[in-house]
């Protein structure tokens, strides 16, 4: 009997243990971040359970309300938003919350305040619920500058100021991927234990990938560099093999695949939507943060994505993120266009 192998299998690194280990590396830590993360994890577990039994519980119909993006809200959207708002406030470690579902930011009452601001999309890709496609929760965490004088400026910061970011994908398995600024790690939910277990330690995106991910239905409205890049993916002139197109339409699922297999995920601006569709604070920033931490890049068509300074909490931006070399290629096309302008 291989006792060493058995020991490896039984020495499970849970997400709580992992975050506590990270905390021990920082002498100034008082455990606030660990408590906050445990509440985010609780929210993810609740939503995972709700997504898994959505059909049985009749949660997947439209709720009859419209969110501020003008999208019909699904019942699961509403439920997920409420769960995360309550979980984050009850942690006692948050100050300002920005949700994709709420028009205004939520300022936590002073007696329950902590030093963190959390920006999140409680259920990204919700239009895919009915057809069983993977959906997910995306979150980013900032530190408040002055706890006694918290303002919207505390969340209207560039993404490079985030202290942590992550997403939880609800699919064939429930996977939580996060970074606290020192690499990216992935955890898979074990339903028998009720715990997230470290299954993807220190994720590194391949330097170059074989996949591109974009909604080609918008191609007629694209700008020059995006059109040229996709043409290059399909019909390479250097004798290399064409890239494969993979597009699910759920950002969490598309980015998760890109992170693990390499390649590029694109949601460019176009004639119809010059700023693209993705929201800066709780979609572009967290995913860009993760990509950079995994050794990739994120670019808006004009600048590094994490250098953007949002003016409003629901601002949108184009984004190109993924393998370092693939993003370099599209950056070169934008630079050439600017030079010729």
UniProtKB/Swiss-Prot annotation:
Q: Which family does it belong to?
A: Belongs to the FBPase class 1 family.
Cellular compartments annotated: Cytoplasm
The note describing how and how many cofactors are bound reads:
Binds 3 Mg(2+) ions per subunit.
InterPro entries xref list: FBPase_C_dom, FBPase_class-1, FBPase_N, FBPtase, Fructose_bisphosphatase_AS
The answer to whether the entry has keyword Cytoplasm is yes
- Entry-linked SUPFAM superfamilies: Carbohydrate phosphatase
This chain's protein is named: Fructose-1,6-bisphosphatase, cytosolic
Q: What is its main location?
A: cytoplasm
- Per UniProt, Mg(2+) 3 binds at 121, 124, 283
Q: Which GO terms describe its molecular function?
A: fructose 1,6-bisphosphate 1-phosphatase activity; metal ion binding
Which catalysed reactions does the entry list for this protein?
beta-D-fructose 1,6-bisphosphate + H2O = beta-D-fructose 6-phosphate + phosphate
